[in-house]
Amino acid sequence: MNEELRAELLSMAEEDRETRDKLLHSGQLPKNNYSPVMKLVHEKNNARIKKIIEQFGWTGKNLVGEDGCEAAWIIVQHAVLEPDFQRQCVPLLESAVAAGEAPLWQLAYLKDRVLKMSGEPQLYGTQYDWSENGKSVPYKIHDEANVDARRREAGLPTMEENTKRIHQEDELLNEKL
């Protein structure tokens, strides 16, 4: 295992989380806009994760451990300023999942993010939009009747359970704004 790379990925993901939490708890994380502070963190992380993936490919469990693998996924998942890069990462993550190097739920989230950014219906129902009343609603879903089966296969909770959790987070966010 590459402990140095693992530590770097964990540090990058932690900075992302801490920045988001700080903005959220101070009421400075906008719902419909991109925080300039968060943007700076993402730009820095994007530049570095691109170099890491170019050098190592997808950073799977054997290379950086489960937590390092998840940290890399978080960084790519949050690379919303770089949709082409996210799209390029999908086949890399697909290969990692097939090899047992990454969990399917990570691929589900990334695929859905890429589909949403392309204006296409998502497969797993992981992406949400804000409604006019300030609540999150699932972004359009392909074959919605079977979404829970796909979610179950990926190790995700049902849409109902997930939407309930998201709405609880919305309430906390709305209290801060």
Predicted regions and their residues:
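N-terminal helix-rich structural modules
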Residues: 1-117
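A short, structure-level motif marking secondary-structure boundaries and short turns
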Residues: 34-35, 131-134, 176
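An amphipathic alpha-helical core segment
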Residues: 93-157
